[in-house]
Every structure is written in structure tokens, then in C-alpha cells.
From Swiss-Prot:
Keyword Repeat: no
GO cellular component: nucleus
Location of the KRAB domain: 29-106
PROSITE patterns: BHLH
Name of the protein described by the UniProt record: Transcription factor bHLH103
Keywords from the UniProt entry: DNA-binding, Nucleus, Transcription, Transcription regulation
Outcome of mutating residue 75 to E: In strain: cv. Cvi-0
UniProt xrefs under InterPro entries: bHLH95_bHLH, bHLH_dom, HLH_DNA-bd_sf, IND-like
Subunit text: Homodimer.
Polar residues compositional bias, start-end: 239-269
Tree of life domain: Eukaryota
Length: 301
């Protein structure tokens, strides 16, 4: 069979090896027309071929698309006008091809491989991506190592941002000055804080036999009682010789101290007691001092 194809002069090795030889054009076979005429077609270089002539020749040529289930050793037989007498030899092949193809079928466009002309341009490398690029594009699932690396980078970035924010906050806060406490030369005394209500209750207990509980009356009676005590003390000091000598000595000391002042220099013992403060005495010691015309029992009734 191969020898018969060599004698035709058309089916050479270069024609079978080209990428466009078998799939350059597709046409359905007919029951009465199987042979392809290549007698008037001249193969030219595709680089110098004009687009118009290329399209005309492309439409004029017709080849057969073999079925995918055919064996790789199946071949297409081509004859020229000079070898018409050999048509009878190929009746068996024609009958076989008639059973494969139907005249009512439409034109099928094969998946043509990438032409050799486009391989010289880098632009068409992106148009016809290879299998490795398609896998890399559609492979959306990243490996676990890449995911862990991304997570570690994000955590490190967040930690650095938080540390920077803390440093900014610390730098913005003003420094507190240390509190300097000067040691006092005087010892700390605990001052007893007494409320005014506590003092009033004490005065109420003092003048409670009179039966008065309001604040104004209690204060008035307390003042009168204090004046009475002062008068009793002055009278007792004046009548007692021992107390008189002590009072006279104290009066002299007080007069010496007050001589530098602008106040009156003739001070009485009553003023001396006021300067020292009020000293309360028990009631039992005052019974002998009051005058006889004063009845002390009437004070407590």
C-alpha cells in the first residue's frame, strides 16, 4: 500500500509531517466524489503567502477528518488527475469511508493544534497556555505550609502594631513628679475633735435639774451658772489668807508680764482667773461660801 502512495508523487513525507496537512480543512465526503485534486495547487511558503490567496486555497482544498476510534495506522488516500485510472483500486476504501460518513452531516471543525507560524510569537504563548499554567491558574487551594506562613506573618504584624501603640501611649502620658515630703520639726499631736452637739449634751447634763432641754435655754442657764461659780471663787479667794497670798503673788507676776502691754495695769483677781481659763469646782465645796441670805436648795428645785 505504501508503495502505491509513493508512486503518486503527491503524498510525500513532508506532506504527512506538516501540522496543516491533515487538519487544514474539513469537508464531508460524497458517495461519488472521494478523491482530492491537488494537481493545480502549488504549496508555497506560509510566510510569503498572501491572506487572500491563502483563504482561496484553504476553501478549495478538502481533507477528511478521521474518527477518533480509527487506528493510528489508518491513512487517507489522495489521487491526482493523472492517476484517475487507479480509482478502481480504491473502491474498497471508498465503500468503507461511505459507511463512516453521512452526506447529511454538517461540517465538523476539528480542534486544530497550535500552528507553527504562531510559535515564533511570544504573544500567542499566553493565548495557548500549557497544561502546567492551567493547573496553576485553577488551583485555588494553597498548601498548608503556605497558609501557616501567612498566619504567622499576620500574627507577627499584629503584635508589632500593638507594641507600637503601647509605646505611643506610654510616651504620651506625662511623668508624675515625686512627692517630696518635708519632715516637720513639731511632733504630731492628735487633736480631739468635739462636735457642738456633744458639748450641748454635756451642758444639758449639767443643768438638767432645771428641766430645760432646748438649746437656747440650756446655754443661757449654763452661762449664768458659770458666772455664779466665778463669783464664788473670787469671794473664797478674798476671804482665805492662804489663797490670798497665793493670789497676790500670781497677781504680781501677771502685772509684771502685762506691764509691757497697752492695757489697763490695774488688774483684779477676777481678770486673772479669766486669763487662765474656767475651772469647775464641785458643788459641795461651795456650800460654805455663799452668803447666808441665799438659799442654795432653791437652785435645784
Amino acid at each position: 500500500m505504501t508503495e502505491e502512495f509513493d508512486t503518486t508523487g503527491v503524498c510525500t513525507g513532508t506532506w504527512w509531517s506538516s501540522s496543516n496537512g491533515m487538519f487544514s480543512g474539513c469537508s464531508l465526503p460524497r458517495s461519488a466524489e472521494i478523491v482530492v485534486d491537488f494537481g493545480e495547487i502549488e504549496w508555497q511558503n506560509i510566510d510569503t503567502l498572501d491572506a487572500k490567496t491563502y483563504n482561496e486555497n484553504y476553501l478549495s482544498t478538502s481533507t477528511f477528518l478521521g474518527n477518533a476510534n480509527l487506528d493510528t495506522t489508518s491513512q487517507i488516500y489522495v489521487s491526482s488527475p493523472s492517476n484517475i485510472h487507479e480509482e478502481e483500486r480504491y473502491n474498497q476504501i471508498n465503500s468503507f469511508l461511505e459507511g463512516l460518513f453521512d452526506s447529511s452531516e454538517q461540517l465538523l471543525v476539528p480542534n486544530c493544534p497550535k500552528p507553527e507560524l504562531f510559535e515564533s510569537f511570544h504573544f500567542f504563548d499566553d493565548v495557548f497556555p500549557n497544561e502546567s499554567r492551567m493547573i496553576s491558574v485553577f488551583d485555588h487551594q494553597k498548601p498548608k505550609e503556605d497558609m501557616q506562613a501567612c498566619k504567622s506573618l499576620t500574627t507577627c504584624k499584629r503584635a508589632s502594631e500593638k507594641s507600637g501603640e503601647l509605646e505611643d501611649i506610654e510616651s504620651s502620658q506625662p511623668l508624675k513628679r515625686p512627692r517630696l515630703e518635708t519632715p516637720s520639726h513639731f511632733p504630731s499631736f492628735k487633736v480631739r475633735k468635739e462636735k457642738l452637739g456633744d458639748r450641748i449634751t454635756a451642758l444639758q447634763q449639767l443643768v438638767s435639774p432645771f428641766g430645760k432641754t432646748d438649746t437656747a435655754s440650756v446655754l443661757h442657764d449654763a452661762i449664768d451658772y458659770i458666772k455664779f461659780l466665778q463669783e464664788q471663787i473670787t469671794e473664797k479667794v478674798s476671804t482665805s489668807p492662804h489663797l490670798n497670798s497665793i493670789g497676790s503673788g500670781e497677781q504680781k507676776q501677771w502685772s509684771d508680764k502685762s506691764s509691757n502691754n497697752t492695757h489697763n495695769q490695774n488688774c483684779s483677781p477676777r481678770q486673772d482667773l479669766r486669763s487662765r481659763g474656767l475651772c469647775l469646782m464641785p458643788i459641795s465645796s461651795t456650800f460654805s461660801t455663799p452668803p447666808q441670805h441665799l438659799d442654795t436648795s432653791s437652785l435645784w428645785n
